[in-house]
Amino acid sequence: MCDDEVAALVVDNGSGMCKAGFAGDDAPRAVFPSIVGRPRHQGVMVGMGQKDSYVGDEAQSKRGILTLKYPIEHGIITNWDDMEKIWHHTFYNELRVAPEEHPVLLTEAPLNPKANREKMTQIMFETFNSPAMYVAIQAVLSLYASGRTTGIVLDSGDGVSHTVPIYEGYALPHAILRLDLAGRDLTDYLMKILTERGYSFTTTAEREIVRDIKEKLCYVALDFEQEMATAAASTSLEKSYELPDGQVITIGNERFRCPESLFQPSFLGMESCGIHETVYNSIMKCDVDIRKDLYANIVMSGGTTMYPGIADRMQKEITSLAPSTIKIKIIAPPERKYSVWIGGSILASLSTFQQMWISKEEYDESGPGIVHRKCF
């Protein structure tokens, strides 16, 4: 197979959104929700061409009549049949490519179970007949995208957050920490506190509206108590939002109370540490000699790190935890929503990477276990 002309595909499967495109591009061509929807009711209109399942944006637009399911929970694929539908949709409908003609780079969550990597490998070679594939860890790709090989990545998406310390390009598995607190939990929490305000959001379709409110209006306060006082004393922090039916709702302290849960998970009734402590704990699990390099390269990635104010707050919180002499730098690139994908695009287009692919021949010879030997 001549690698000169065939572009590799890069597919970043997140819990909330799937990002897909071609290696060498600077942004994904396709970004769509990782959703599979099935009709709640029997079709009555003859000849309407009703399907038994819908994927991505189409599922999203027909959400009123569908039950929506996310095949990826907390960053890890739990429903393989639906996942196959998502990949099929990615190749044939979004990118419009024949998967058997392109090498494909997939991404995985840190600490992904071994059986899962094998299953991904098997599906790519056996269902989609890929000529070659590779599985890369999401956080490592984000670090590449920021132009570094050493640093600690806080990757927070829709389903899960991880802190991943990376030294000279290798993730340090003993120091990776996972926090099951991410965008979807914040959306649920916003639904809850808006309900307390008298607005009712309950269905899966309404959850998507709340997600939009969250993405457009929420921010992280530098000082939570002070912000609460400001919100109580004036209406300066209030914003209005128009619902799809034309009703206008007003949202005040919910704007920063919602993402505050990242720093105070007790808001959600969770006993875990906030993201700032998780980053600190992760650094403390690393060798004392490399901590200085990690503190100076704290890289944020993923959609849940997109809140205005999050980097400044992180800087403040880590500064109060870390030794006073240490230099702390938070890197929050503007494109961090897609930095995993961008890192994959960079990696798959490097000439030095070309010998890293797992080829169909190697797979046929060794079986799915090959993924553990070639992708690390």
Curated annotation (Swiss-Prot):
The modification Tele-methylhistidine is found at residue 74. Its main location: cytoplasm. It catalyses: ATP + H2O = ADP + phosphate + H(+). Keywords: Acetylation, ATP-binding, Cytoplasm, Cytoskeleton, Hydrolase, Methylation, Nucleotide-binding, Oxidation. The modification N-acetylaspartate is found at residue 3. Pfam families: Actin. PROSITE patterns: ACTINS_1, ACTINS_2, ACTINS_ACT_LIKE. N-terminal cleavage of acetylated cysteine of immature actin by ACTMAP. Oxidation of Met-45 by Mical to form methionine sulfoxide promotes actin filament depolymerization. Methionine sulfoxide is produced stereospecifically, but it is not known whether the (S)-S-oxide or the (R)-S-oxide is produced. GO terms for cellular component: actin cytoskeleton; cytoplasm; plasma membrane. SMART domains: ACTIN. It is found in: Cytoplasm, Cytoskeleton. Signal peptide: none annotated. Residues 1-2 form a propeptide. InterPro entries: Actin, Actin/actin-like_CS, Actin_CS, ATPase_NBD. The modification Methionine sulfoxide is found at residues 45, 48. GO terms for molecular function: ATP binding; hydrolase activity. GO terms for biological process: mitotic cytokinesis; ovarian fusome organization; regulation of synapse organization. Its EC number is 3.6.4.-. In Drosophila there are 6 closely related actin genes. Actins are highly conserved proteins that are involved in various types of cell motility and are ubiquitously expressed in all eukaryotic cells. Belongs to the actin family. This is Actin-57B. It comes from Drosophila melanogaster. The gene is Act57B.
